[in-house]
Design a protein with these regions (language model features):
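Conserved MFS/SLC helix-loop-helix module at the cytosolic interface between two early adjacent transmembrane helices
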Residues: 68-107
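Structural signature of the two symmetry-related core transmembrane helices
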Residues: 84-98, 179, 289-304
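Paired small-residue
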Residues: 92-99, 107-115, 316-324
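Helix-loop-helix hairpin linking two adjacent transmembrane segments in secondary transporters
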Residues: 104, 108, 145-191
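C-terminal transmembrane helical hairpin of 12-TM major facilitator-type secondary transporters
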Residues: 290-325
């Protein structure tokens, strides 16, 4: 019979550092999957001869696939284990990334992006599950915090790297980079990551249980109080993400090589806000801190609309509004 310590730490202590590196890689997969090809959106519209709204479906379908997969990845890993679900998910990510890179038309690219999201989601969901499996509860929060500090580099460096890939190699290069990153993670999981779910639940995927659990969550007022502000904030961020390159490069004539820096500056406001939030939470509490943040976002958006109403149209206005929002 396994001891309680074994149940909490199925991974040997000497392997914790490689596991932490893997967790960082898993968490970086999602922002890099979106940010790395943003500078290529105007080029995609030109190459395939489609309107900007069609090109933006490559991002919308990724978000839809990523969101939907969260409902099934967790239960599947609870039943079959983290390792097999992760291996299948990363293999799907690599194949889908190669399909994106080789896509002869926009239709296949949109479908491949949806499949890419399914594989990407497995890495994100299982990364957090591995933390719960491999680390004691007192340590898991610190592990996530440490991984998240490295994660902040992805939305800062991803668009910059993607801009140079677009300028140097064209739009397919970003998806080739995705496939290389996915293949490296797949090899690392296969060679280095043992199974961390030592107590598999054969009933985790039963439909009745899933429906009951979803009902409990959806019926909780606390869930909606926290989920709705987060969803609205997330939606506004993706509205900027999906249109930023098209507006900055096509409309405001920002050079493609400079797009990544503009985007990174806007994202730095989000990262700075998280630092400020951590300082405000102990002093004001969650509810008051959320009100302060919401009021600042509303004020920034209103100032942006007022500036547009006065006829101002400059790339710095767009980037500045995103930084403040």
């Amino acid at each position: 019979m396994s001891s309680q310590s074994d149940a909490i730490h199925p991974i040997p202590a000497y392997a914790h550092a490689p596991v932490l590196l893997l967790i960082i890689g898993f968490l970086m997969l999602q922002p890099l999957s979106t940010d790395l090809y943003l500078a290529s959106l105007p080029s995609l519209a030109t190459v395939f001869g489609v309107p900007a709204s069609t090109v933006q479906l490559t991002l919308s379908m990724f978000v839809a696939g990523f969101g939907g997969a969260q409902l099934i990845i967790g239960p599947l890993s609870d039943r079959y284990g983290r390792r097999p679900v992760l291996l299948v998910g990363l293999a799907l990510y690599v194949i889908a990334s190669l399909l994106c890179a080789a896509a002869p038309g926009i239709d296949l690219l949109i479908v491949a992006r949806f499949l890419q999201a399914l594989g990407c989601c497995s890495a994100i969901i299982i990364a957090r599950a591995i933390v719960r499996d491999a680390y004691a509860p007192a340590d898991s929060a610190r592990v996530i915090a440490r991984a998240s500090s490295w994660l902040s580099l992805a939305p800062l460096l991803g668009p910059i790297l993607g801009s140079y890939l677009q300028v140097t190699f064209g739009w397919r290069a970003a998806f080739v980079a995705h496939s290389i990153l996915g293949a490296c993670l797949l090899a690392a999981v296969y060679l280095r990551l043992p199974e961390t779910n030592v107590h598999k639940n054969p009933r985790a995927t039963e439909l009745a249980g899933l429906i009951h659990n979803f009902g409990v969550v959806l019926g909780a007022r606390e869930f909606w109080a926290n989920a709705l502000p987060g969803a609205l904030s997330y939606g506004s961020i993706f509205a900027f993400i999906s249109g930023s390159s098209l507006v900055l490069i096509r409309v405001l004539h920002v050079p493609t090589a400079w797009f990544g820096y503009c985007f990174a500056f806007g994202v730095s406001g989000y990262l700075g806000g998280t630092i400020v939030c951590r300082r405000l939470l102990p002093k004001f509490g969650q509810a008051t801190t959320q009100r302060i943040g919401s009021a600042m976002s509303l004020a920034a958006g209103a100032l942006f609309l007022a500036a547009l109403g006065l006829g101002a149209a400059h790339w710095s206005l767009v980037v500045g509004a995103m930084f403040l929002t």
